Amino acid sequence: MFEQNLTSEALTVTTVTSQDQITQKPLRDSVKASLKNYLAQLNGQEVTELYELVLAEVEQPLLDTIMQYTRGNQTRAATMMGINRGTLRKKLKKYGMN
């Protein structure tokens, strides 16, 4: 039986420095750095619905990529994501991807 051995450690961001050095770091580190940068730029301004903003920034490209990977097969995409097909359809509709 196949045992899935991938963890969040497998989700990495690859960058190339100005000295052409290639580095990889976990996606979560990039998200954290982006959030810190965003908050620093607020300059004391109030922000609301940050949770929804961050989810949308991650969820939409996730859905797009998974739908391309599965060639539009919603059942397979939902299974890969660990959600039911109805939830997937609702999310696709939310982002105008249906």
UniProtKB/Swiss-Prot annotation:
Pfam families: HTH_8
Entry keyword set: Activator, DNA-binding, Transcription, Transcription regulation
Any GO MF annotation of the entry: sequence-specific DNA binding
InterPro entries named in the record: Fis_DNA-bd, Homeodomain-like_sf, HTH_Fis, Trans_regulatory_Fis
Keyword Endoplasmic reticulum among UniProt keywords: no
DNA-binding region per Swiss-Prot/TrEMBL record: 74-93
Subunit annotation: Homodimer.
Family: Belongs to the transcriptional regulatory Fis family.
Biological function: Activates ribosomal RNA transcription. Plays a direct role in upstream activation of rRNA promoters.
Protein name as annotated: DNA-binding protein Fis
Species assigned in the record: Vibrio cholerae serotype O1 (strain ATCC 39315 / El Tor Inaba N16961)
Gene behind this protein: fis
